[in-house]
Amino acid sequence: MNAKKWVLSLPVIVLILAALLAGFNYVTDPFGAFGDRFMQWFSYDETNNPRAAKISYLEQHHDEYDSYFLGCSSTSSLPTESFNEMLNAKFYNLIMYGADMKDCEKIANYLIDNYTVKNLVLNVYLDNGLTYDDESNKLTHSLHYKTDPDMSALSYYSRFLLADPRYGYQKLVNKSKDTLMPQSFDVFDEQTGAYDKRVRDVEPIGSTADYLNAYPVFTDYPNHEPLHLYKTEACMQSVAAIRKVCEENGVNLIVLTAPVYTDYYKNFYDDDITNFYESLAKVTDYW
């Protein structure tokens, strides 16, 4: 092949390879970005990206729910069955790794605009004063474009269609290893949205010494200078926006802040911690 033919052929080759890559990523859909039409393995997708995959799941199942938990990882500990009974509701848990309050605001708006929402339980965690509107990874922490007015459909679909094919390949490999019990690659319960704790709940705790030996993080918190909660004001602006949209649409909003270990407070300055909780109290009542 002479140089001229090679130059003319190169764009065609690139387009063919891009089409093959996009097709593979669409079929395997390791982040649940396209609704996982072929594998329907949302517990896996949500483990990779709960922000996108859970919205894809709700697009297909939203008629099964009328209430939602919203917040970062500690939100998963809220007992779905108890809240269902207490509020005569059908809850789905939209826990997201490292969710900041801007994520929560955008998703709350989407839920209320598109689905039936009777109750919204919002977990405002102390770390929400530390980060705000921060997409740390375009694949694993990306919102679904339908929940994010700042993201175009083109930007959303292109990032997942042209993603590294190793993500899709790994999904196929892990599918062959899948069992009835949760593993590290499928940690969510699809029907509730919460962490699937069937294995964790039967784990023998043993003595305090045994437990701390197995989970040394509880005795060895990171030793660093305290951090400032610089994003507290922005966080509270989003909480206020969520409260407002709930009031306007007759949604019962319950705000809580998940408890933390005493040693965890050492990560932050005392004045910042006080300001965070006092600022939240000025915006809304909370548990």
Locate the predicted segments by residue:
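Membrane-embedded segments
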Residues: E64, F69-Y156
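Secreted/periplasmic serine-hydrolase-like ester/acetyl group-modifying domain
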Residues: D133, N137-N249
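Second-shell loop/turn segments in exported
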Residues: N93-G98, E225-T232, Y265-F268
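Cytosolic-side transmembrane helix boundary signature
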Residues: M1-V7
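Short extracytoplasmic
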Residues: S43-F69
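Hydrophobic membrane-insertion alpha-helices, especially the h-region
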Residues: L8-Y26
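Extended hydrophobic/aromatic segments used for targeting, binding, or gating
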Residues: A234, A241-W287
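Alpha-helical transmembrane signal-anchor/signal-peptide segments
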Residues: V27-R51
